[in-house]
Amino acid sequence: MTFSLFGDKFTRHSGITLLMEDLNDGLRTPGAIMLGGGNPAQIPEMQDYFQTLLTDMLESGKATDALCNYDGPQGKTELLTLLAGMLREKLGWDIEPQNIALTNGSQSAFFYLFNLFAGRRADGRVKKVLFPLAPEYIGYADAGLEEDLFVSARPNIELLPEGQFKYHVDFEHLHIGEETGMICVSRPTNPTGNVITDEELLKLDALANQHGIPLVIDNAYGVPFPGIIFSEARPLWNPNIVLCMSLSKLGLPGSRCGIIIANEKIITAITNMNGIISLAPGGIGPAMMCEMIKRNDLLRLSETVIKPFYYQRVQETIAIIRRYLPENRCLIHKPEGAIFLWLWFKDLPITTKQLYQRLKARGVLMVPGHNFFPGLDKPWPHTHQCMRMNYVPEPEKIEAGVKILAEEIERAWAESH
């Protein structure tokens, strides 16, 4: 039995499948310290809220309705209307229900978008996806139907006090040409916790407009929900921007509900793709979200429960790291949002891929940084000096993991002398 080219491409071992397998193995391995995956925190107050909400929905028959009926291929009409109204009212955006489509998780939204705007055209030209600020999300790297669909730009690195640093878009060397089909940024960024500034975003928007290509913003952690963002950042949308959101980081990753906000032409295309690939998006997540909007809970919980929880967790985690790893051993990307810390082990004598294997052997899972630079034009040592860690677990788990990390860093340095 042999596979097609499509089959060959999508059965290869990719960074994202490896990550998900490690996550799964770790969840089943007693004592494993999971600092690798992207699972959001199970915040007690949110768990209680969802429990009550689902109980109410069962009693009123709304849960049964959502599970026993198909929604349309654009997604639940009631949610499209409620969400458009909320965004118009709260952010002043000129949005109607026909500017929104739902997908089965934002991972599938990106698969649709990358292959809509990049790849082979009718005239034979091949367009690419430009990531103007690498490192960028691991799950993008293999989502193209064509090979080599992605181009990443190296960032400028700003060194900050207290052993922190921040990546910025290097506009001076940013190349947008005939071959660029779309620009894509996550804000806040998974893996680094970086939030590109309002000024950088407006500049990217202007460049995208100038070249007649869309700017796609992955807003999985951003404002107005789930609000896991700790710096001042103004949400941006206009008809040339495709904004992607999700219910996962509210604490509902199992609902697999992605949200795309775009101009009507793009929404029509996404709706058609939904119909062909999955008939319709799942209904239970959207039904829950409808209730959350109607009860005025969606933005309230994002602001008063979710954001403060993660902010406290990230501060605790940085304090733990600094107890074991001084600035000369480990720099930390300024944590401006998302659920990860990005650690830079400058001049480390081993690669972070080797470090990952050593940590894994000791029951600690983190993600090596080289996976987050898809399509860099030339090798860059920095890509092998960074690791992503999830700061969501309990502080005692974080401490146990960081202690082992520090031991392995010291061991690597000792071996090099």
Swiss-Prot record:
Its cofactor is pyridoxal 5'-phosphate. Coiled coil: none annotated. The modification N6-(pyridoxal phosphate)lysine is found at residue 249. GO terms for molecular function: pyridoxal phosphate binding; transaminase activity; valine-pyruvate transaminase activity. It comes from the Bacteria. Its main location: cytoplasm. GO terms for cellular component: cytosol. GO terms for biological process: alpha-amino acid metabolic process; D-alanine biosynthetic process; L-alanine biosynthetic process; L-valine biosynthetic process. It holds the Pfam family Aminotran_1_2. SUPFAM superfamilies: PLP-dependent transferases (SSF53383). Its EC number is 2.6.1.66. Signal peptide: none annotated. It is found in: Cytoplasm. It is an enzyme of class 2 (transferase). Keywords: Aminotransferase, Cytoplasm, Pyridoxal phosphate, Transferase. Gene3D superfamilies: Type I PLP-dependent aspartate aminotransferase-like (Major domain) (3.40.640.10). CDD domains: AAT_like. Induction: Modestly repressed by alanine and leucine via Lrp. Amino acid limitation causes repression by promoting the accumulation of L-alanine or L-leucine or both. AvtA is also repressed by L-alpha-aminobutyric acid and other nonprotein amino acids which are structurally similar to L-alanine. It catalyses: L-valine + pyruvate = 3-methyl-2-oxobutanoate + L-alanine. Involved in the biosynthesis of alanine. Homodimer. Belongs to the class-I pyridoxal-phosphate-dependent aminotransferase family. This is Valine--pyruvate aminotransferase. It comes from Escherichia coli (strain K12). The lineage of its organism: Bacteria, Pseudomonadati, Pseudomonadota, Gammaproteobacteria, Enterobacterales. The gene is avtA.
